[in-house]
């Protein structure tokens, strides 16, 4: 903690609150690596040149006037919700740069159209224009395409896909990974004395990911899986059949894990009761898909827990975003904000040439809108998540998110 306080004391005064939070954790790690003598003061951080009072108008595809260029690749020209999300992520990136206190960055905004070919071309163009890092794209196939180009040029990419199959060294995912949700909620349940677990999981790509994480985490906590069944999504008959198959095991369970969303969870609980399983006295568990006020209002979910970022950070970000752009952001807009803030911190603390795999993989991590996070060498991330509990028709924090990775149970 002493190191964190010292780091904070040497942060440049021009940093905005979000960037100061990111920089404090990054600086703490850098200072600790400089030597073992606590009394040795770190070298002063040079102040950034004063920004001009008035800047010339900029084109829509460029944000900022700094000397260090990074690319932001999004499906701005795609149709439907993809374009809406892309616009919101672009705005969030602009907000982050404005809050960065004169960061020496310039963002080159590129449209991939939501296609692999577009992402590959956008990445190539951005790197030819001098980008030293890529933020985005949004989808798994576009991250893979842009990441291939970035790796060939030894330029790091921080993307927003939740598909860990596209992550690798140099291609990092800042998204909310379902594996992290599962690990956090299972470990919390185990800390509350739960030892036997049953699960009903959707038979789809998401279900396969969370099932693998569940099978790995439960025994790691000293627990055992007494039943696990899959079901076809959207089918009441499939819910009923899966409930019958798992009924005997579920009766023995201390905790029931149902990683689904919307109307499916109450229907699955009803199917379990019809099969003779009484959920009373069993800990209901979900993932971030449960982070929905409509789901929380259902009495059948009372007492249920799931992992998610502490909502306070996002609410503050959403308020700042709405004040700046006149409408609320999409939920994933915080990812673009944190990715740009991350790049600004690295340039601020390590200089114009400082963006590298080593800097991005800082083991102390960074603190952003959605709490602390850090990247692993394989391109995936770890996040400090809160455990949320459904209570009285609402949602409250049952176990706060850790503020650092030192000694945190993640």
List PLM regions with ranges.
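Beta-alpha junction/loop-to-helix N-cap segments that form part of ligand/metal-binding clefts
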Residues: 87-88, 99-165
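Periplasmic-binding protein-like
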Residues: 126-138, 158-160, 196-201, 250-265, ...
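Short beta-strand elements at the ligand-binding edges of bilobed clamshell
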Residues: 156-158, 165-187, 201, 228, ...
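An alpha-beta-alpha
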Residues: 173-230
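Extracellular/periplasmic periplasmic-binding protein-like sensory domains
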Residues: 253, 265-337, 350-351, 401, ...
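Segments of small-molecule ligand-sensing domains
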Residues: 325-397, 408-410
């Amino acid at each position: 903690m002493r190191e964190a306080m010292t780091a904070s004391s040497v942060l440049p005064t021009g940093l905005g609150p979000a960037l100061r939070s990111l920089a404090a954790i990054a600086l703490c790690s850098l200072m600790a690596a400089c030597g073992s003598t606590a009394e040795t003061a770190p070298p002063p951080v040079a102040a950034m040149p004063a920004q001009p009072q008035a800047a010339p108008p900029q084109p829509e595809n460029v944000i900022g006037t700094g000397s260090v260029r990074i690319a932001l690749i999004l499906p701005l020209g795609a149709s439907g919700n993809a374009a809406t999300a892309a616009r919101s992520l672009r705005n969030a990136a602009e907000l982050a740069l404005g809050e960065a206190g004169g960061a020496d960055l310039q963002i080159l905004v590129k449209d991939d159209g939501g296609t692999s070919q577009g992402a590959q071309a956008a990445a190539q163009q951005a790197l030819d224009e001098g980008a030293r890092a890529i933020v985005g794209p949004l989808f798994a196939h576009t991250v893979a395409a842009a990441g291939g180009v970035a790796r060939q040029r030894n330029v790091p990419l921080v993307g927003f896909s939740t598909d860990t199959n596209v992550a690798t060294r140099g291609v990092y995912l800042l998204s909310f990974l379902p594996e992290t949700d599962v690990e956090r909620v299972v470990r919390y349940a185990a800390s509350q004395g739960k030892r036997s677990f049953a699960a009903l999981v959707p038979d789809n790509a998401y279900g396969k990911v969370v099932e693998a994480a569940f099978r790995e985490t439960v025994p790691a906590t000293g627990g055992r899986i007494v039943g696990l069944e899959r079901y076809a999504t959207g089918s009441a008959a499939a819910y009923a059949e899966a409930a019958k198959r798992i009924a005997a095991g579920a009766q023995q369970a201390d905790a029931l894990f149902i990683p689904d969303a919307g109307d499916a969870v109450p229907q699955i609980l009803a199917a379990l009761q019809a099969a003779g399983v009484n959920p009373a006295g069993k800990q209901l568990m979900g993932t971030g898909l449960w982070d929905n006020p409509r789901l929380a209002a259902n009495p059948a979910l009372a007492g249920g827990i799931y992992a998610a970022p502490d909502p306070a950070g996002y609410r503050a970000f959403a308020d700042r975003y709405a004040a700046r752009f006149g409408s609320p952001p999409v939920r994933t807009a915080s990812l673009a904000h944190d990715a740009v803030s991350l790049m600004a911190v690295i340039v601020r603390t390590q200089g114009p040439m400082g963006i590298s795999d080593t800097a991005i993989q800082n083991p102390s991590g960074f603190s952003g809108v959605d709490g602390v996070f850090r990247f692993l060498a394989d391109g995936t991330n770890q996040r400090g998540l809160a455990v949320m509990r459904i209570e009285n028709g609402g949602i409250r924090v049952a176990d706060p998110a850790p503020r650092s990775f030192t000694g945190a149970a993640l």
